Regions:
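A short, well-ordered alpha-helix in the C-terminal region of glycosyltransferases
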Residues: 280, 359, 366, 373-389, ...
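Short hydrophobic beta-strand element within catalytic cores of glycosyltransferases
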Residues: 321-326, 330-333, 343
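Conserved donor-binding/catalytic core segment of Leloir-type glycosyltransferases
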Residues: 179, 217-235, 241-244, 302
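Conserved acidic donor-binding segment of nucleotide-sugar-dependent glycosyltransferases
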Residues: 345-346, 350-357, 366-372
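Nucleotide-activated donor-binding/catalytic signature segment of Leloir-type glycosyltransferases, i.e.
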Residues: 267-290
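Acidic anion/phosphate-binding donor-loop and adjacent secondary structure
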Residues: 158-162, 190, 196, 206-221
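Carbohydrate-associated surface elements
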Residues: 184, 205
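Acidic donor-binding loop of glycosyltransferase active sites
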Residues: 297-312, 329
């Protein structure tokens, strides 16, 4: 069986869950091809990118110059190359294909792809990718069934929903399977009109064989706090920094490290400077997986205070939390989106309300006083939860069976 992965951009260092799923299907013995519209960041990559030689497995459909005018010229040129083919003309149907017709994306792809790209099933990560995949299938560019995974921003952001809700409703008809990563998103897809029989919750998970539980350790002095996240609003790192200001005022000894890159980097650095926290808060930027693991080994607590963005953008269920729980690092997060489906408050971790820096500071201060006897049962339940409900190997085998039955 051949499995295709259809992505808008690949690779992206922040989307380790996509990378992990691709390599898992390779490891299970499936023939795997990656089809991506645009080339992502091939410099800041994880070890699996090289180990599995994923560049050789990837077909990029839009190898374009930068700049709006240059892109349109390039697309027009590609469109003209295939103007003698029926599907290139069909791709210019504004009424049927909307913005992707108007901006010449579909016609340019039709112009350059002579032989259809085939897979038994394409897994499209994020709703908009599923929408594009379904259009390209209708145009004969790809051939195979389409299963679309809905993660977070694609089913929560107001801007995305304003644009894509009619497109999603078309996808519910054209696509073969919708795979929300949480029960919350499954309910939302149903409310948007997706037939229940086309929905199956398929969670993101972690490879438990990569995460051996570390010994339970009491919080150190200073308390070692860590976050690993893309630097965006919904990660709530601005709330974490405000909580750090309060912790420092209270005289709590701590060090906080934020690993990741993203559009909010300058804003977060400015906040650190404004609060004069440079001595206790560090932002070392992107780190590959093996370096992140080494830093996590020293952490006392993993912090991810996710919030709903101003545009409505929400998390799915963050894989970073699963990884921390799998290795035995206590987690502090928020009552946000699907996170309570993973973290049971005061049982397998600690949850505070969104956007509540005071509650977050209080929780971290209280955490710093816990001993190993208090931590041990929480850490045990956390790993058991991930092992039972978020075990990547089990999830991927179940997904493979689901796709084979399509």
């Amino acid at each position: 069986m051949k499995v295709g992965f259809f992505l808008l951009k690949f690779p992206l260092s922040s989307e380790t869950f996509v990378l992990n799923q691709i390599t898992a299907f390779i490891d299970m013995g499936f023939e795997v091809e990656i089809v991506a519209l645009q080339k992502g960041d091939t410099q800041n990559t994880h070890a699996a990118w090289t180990k599995y030689n994923l560049a050789a497995r990837t077909r990029w459909l839009q190898d374009e110059p930068t700049g709006k005018v240059a892109k349109l010229r390039h697309r027009a040129s590609q469109t003209l190359r295939g103007i003698h083919r029926k599907n290139t003309w069909q791709a210019l149907n504004l009424k049927r294909y909307g913005a992707e017709s108007r901006n010449l994306i579909l016609s340019a792809i039709c112009g350059q792809v002579v032989t259809p790209l085939h897979a038994d099933v394409f897994i499209a990560h994020f709703g908009p990718a599923g929408v594009t995949a379904a259009k390209l299938r209708e145009l004969g560019v790809i051939r195979g069934k389409i299963a679309t995974i809905f993660h977070g921003i694609d089913i929560s952001s107001r801007d995305v929903l304003n644009h894509y809700t009619p497109e999603y409703q078309q996808l519910f008809r054209r696509g073969d399977l919708m795979l929300p990563i949480s029960d919350l998103w499954a309910g939302r897809l149903q409310k948007m009109g997706c037939p229940r029989e086309k929905i199956a919750v398929s969670r993101m998970g972690v490879d438990m064989t990569r995460f051996s539980p570390r010994p339970v350790k009491a919080p150190a002095t200073p308390l070692e706090i860590i976050s690993v996240a893309r630097l965006t609003e919904k990660k709530g790192l601005h709330v974490a920094i405000e909580a750090c200001r309060q912790l420092k005022e209270q005289g709590v000894a701590f060090r906080y490290r934020i690993l990741g890159i993203g559009p909010w980097e300058r804003r977060l650095r400015t906040l650190i400077e404004q609060y004069q926290l440079e001595d206790v808060v560090e932002m070392p930027g992107f780190k590959p997986s093996h370096e992140v693991k080494a830093i996590l080994d020293d952490a006392d607590v993993f912090l991810l205070p996710s919030v709903t963005g101003a545009d409505g953008d929400m998390e799915g269920i963050p894989v970073a939390l699963m990884e921390a729980m799998a290795v035995g690092i206590p987690v502090v997060s928020t009552l946000h989106s699907g996170i309570p489906e993973l973290v049971e408050a005061d049982k397998s971790g600690w949850l505070v309300p969104e956007n509540d820096a005071r509650a977050l500071a209080q929780r971290l201060a209280a955490f710093s006083q816990l001993d190993t006897d208090e931590l041990a049962p929480v850490i045990k339940r956390a790993r058991e939860k991930v092992e039972h409900d978020f075990n990547q190997q089990v999830i991927n085998r179940e997904l493979a069976s689901l796709l084979q039955a399509l």
